[in-house]
């Protein structure tokens, strides 16, 4: 039995929730997010709160209810406050710039790397070696950050590459003679 699923998701003022079967739509000041919930989960909307429980006949009902609760809680936080992810570029000549919805990266290749951002994600560069991603969809922000990091992962000897701001890169010792 999931302890996570037992806690209701409180819906703050200014957030609108539409429940249509297993499709839930949450709208707030930062946009609108829609998600289809697993058939094993029963959702009830009452008193500015969403409650979750398993449907009869499903073995993994409580597990799916806990997952659904966590996803919908992230959606509510996303449309009210939003999510941010910070990336750092470490290395000589590594630079980033944002033009519209395209992130331009100079990562030591013979060509610049242009990454187009999906709808709902915005990026800004406070400095040439920092990228800040903002948006309402937690999963999409993480995916875009992982895609940008994948162009040049931090290497284990000098730590050069694209890394998350809170990431600790373990470096190896150089070869001894």
UniProtKB/Swiss-Prot annotation:
Record flagged with keyword Ribosomal protein: yes
Keywords: Ribonucleoprotein, Ribosomal protein, RNA-binding, rRNA-binding
InterPro entries xref list: Ribosomal_uL6-like (IPR000702), Ribosomal_uL6-like_a/b-dom_sf (IPR036789), Ribosomal_uL6_a/b-dom (IPR020040), Ribosomal_uL6_bac-type (IPR019906), Ribosomal_uL6_CS (IPR002358)
A biological process term (GO) from this entry: cytoplasmic translation
GO cellular component, one term: cytosolic large ribosomal subunit
Function: This protein binds to the 23S rRNA, and is important in its secondary structure. It is located near the subunit interface in the base of the L7/L12 stalk, and near the tRNA binding site of the peptidyltransferase center.
Family under the similarity heading: Belongs to the universal ribosomal protein uL6 family.
Quaternary structure and interacting proteins, as annotated: Part of the 50S ribosomal subunit.
Protein name (database record): Large ribosomal subunit protein uL6
Organism: Edwardsiella ictaluri (strain 93-146)
